[in-house]
A protein has these predicted regions:
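Active-site-proximal beta-strands of protease catalytic cores
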Residues: 113-114
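Basic, Lys/Arg-enriched alpha-helical interface segments
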Residues: 1-95, 105-108, 117-159
Length: 159
């Protein structure tokens, strides 16, 4: 049987978020800021989006995601078995994605790896899939380069 995301398991909570960073940059934190600045037209809209993101991350840290259509549990990333995908849908077809890892060696960690907007406008279905797969691959590369990654994290997700 495959794994389910920690973000849906309150028995193991609380979990802690750690965001991928380098010695010189808060990479994932900066990605989220860049994503929101790119798409938000007012400070109010930025603040609203960031509050929705932070609220979901807090619920995830308590193992409280899933169970509703408004806030589904993270989906396993089939092409990158060590990753999970959390989705936010904002008005005007704006689809924010976060890929995270859940290292088996660190049972209380949710490791944020990559934020991006899913590109939809003017692209074919194949182009959308290719662009998203590239984002997933970048997240997987970051994870594999981290000290908390192990090959055991690559267990296939359930179908």
């Amino acid at each position: 049987m495959g794994r389910t995301s920690r973000t849906t398991d309150p028995d193991g909570a609380p979990y802690r978020w750690e965001l991928f960073a380098t010695k010189t940059a808060r990479v994932v934190e900066n990605e989220l800021d860049r994503c929101l600045r790119e798409r938000c037209t007012t400070q109010y809209e930025y603040d609203m989006f960031i509050s929705r993101v932070e609220a979901r991350l807090e619920r995830a840290s308590q193992g409280g995601l899933g169970g509703s259509d408004d806030e589904p549990s993270p989906d396993p990333v089939v092409s990158q078995p060590a990753l999970w995908e959390t989705r936010w849908s904002f008005k005007k077809r704006r689809e924010l994605r976060l890929y995270h890892g859940e290292p088996l060696s660190v049972p209380d960690l949710l490791f944020g790896l990559k934020y991006h907007w899913k590109r939809l406008d003017g692209l074919s279905a194949d182009e959308i899939e290719s662009a998203q797969n590239a984002e997933m691959a970048e997240a997987a590369t970051r994870y594999r380069a981290s000290s908390c990654y192990s090959s055991a994290d690559e267990q296939p997700h359930p179908n």
